[in-house]
């Protein structure tokens, strides 16, 4: 081998070593949605990975579902917490009954996302953070409203109703439109206060404080402040909503480079049942604690990080 060949080999070897080093040190980009629980779970993931020696870039509170999906598909983020029931909307399968069953919904979205987008769904939490509507307790009591069927009849009969919600909840076919179809009511534009961001902390507070005449709010099944702020969740007796179990989803190539992500996160999400998420969300929404602090305190209390 002559001098020129040796130099070429050395340059190539140096380049390969540099590429390998970059692959090993490139941070895992952790994202999350902009709502309270999104911020909480995004920080849970970021802190847990970091505590176990995985370098991360925390990009929590990035945006809504559409933004997060686009970001993970193009590689702007590598991992974020998503909900199994959103598979119905993401893959245009709103009529598939699988989404109403926790196990079937998880298996369906896991299969679809891996095949179509090379995105891996890790094991979900046992919680169900389904979309719902919460009404001020004084209104619910006075009008005997316990279910969405009761609410639909009351609204259709001329009940004074105004809902605070995100644009996503109002526009998505599997959210407010699905409730209206199933329970036989139709809100006029003036009966909806659309709030930017999509955080249920904002919609619930708007109902509690009667902002612009609002007396009901878009809420999630694991929202902490619903009862504390004097609202009552309307029961979805027709099971309109899918099961929304939170789970970490990660780009396949990133998981291949960092396989311990799976073993780190699965016991953590298993510990995040509905009651636990409600309590953690309440610390953020009612007590005003920082989402990162709440996430860290939870992980430490469970002995999941030091």
Report each predicted region and the residues it spans.
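N-terminal export leaders
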Residues: 6-10
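Extracytoplasmic "Venus flytrap"
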Residues: 27-45, 61-64, 168-171
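Short, polar/charged alpha-helical segment
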Residues: 36-55, 177, 181-183
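Short helices/loops that flank or line small-molecule/ion binding pockets
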Residues: 47-48, 66-77, 93, 182, ...
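Contiguous mixed-secondary-structure segments that line small-molecule binding/active-site clefts
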Residues: 84-177, 181-185, 189-198, 209, ...
């Amino acid at each position: 081998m002559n001098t020129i060949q040796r130099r070429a080999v050395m340059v190539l070897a140096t380049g390969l070593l540099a590429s390998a080093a970059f692959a090993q040190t490139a941070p895992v980009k952790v994202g999350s949605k902009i709502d309270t629980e999104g911020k909480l779970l995004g920080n849970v993931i970021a802190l847990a990975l970091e505590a176990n020696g995985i370098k991360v870039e925390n990009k929590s509170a990035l945006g809504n579902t559409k933004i997060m999906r686009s970001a993970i598909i193009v590689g702007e983020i590598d991992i974020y917490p998503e909900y199994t029931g959103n598979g119905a909307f993401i893959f245009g399968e709103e009529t598939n009954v699988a989404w109403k069953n926790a196990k079937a919904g998880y298996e369906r979205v896991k299969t679809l996302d891996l095949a179509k987008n090379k995105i891996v769904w890790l094991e979900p939490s046992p919680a169900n953070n389904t979309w719902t509507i919460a009404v001020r307790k004084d209104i619910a009591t006075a009008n005997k409203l316990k279910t969405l069927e009761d609410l639909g009849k009351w609204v259709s009969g001329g009940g004074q109703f105004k809902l605070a919600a995100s644009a996503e909840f109002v526009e998505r076919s599997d959210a407010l439109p699905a409730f209206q179809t199933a329970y036989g009511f139709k809100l006029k534009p003036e009966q909806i206060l659309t709030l930017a961001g999509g955080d249920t902390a904002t919609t619930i507070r708007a109902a509690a404080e009667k902002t612009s005449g609002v007396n009901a709010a878009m809420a999630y099944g694991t929202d902490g402040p619903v009862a504390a702020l004097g609202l009552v969740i309307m029961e979805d007796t027709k099971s309109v909503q899918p099961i929304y179990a939170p789970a970490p989803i990660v780009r396949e190539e990133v998981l291949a480079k960092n396989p311990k992500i799976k073993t780190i996160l699965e016991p953590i999400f298993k510990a995040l049942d509905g009651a636990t998420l409600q309590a953690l969300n309440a610390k953020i929404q009612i007590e005003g604690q920082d989402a990162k602090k709440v996430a860290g305190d939870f992980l430490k209390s469970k002995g999941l990080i030091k």
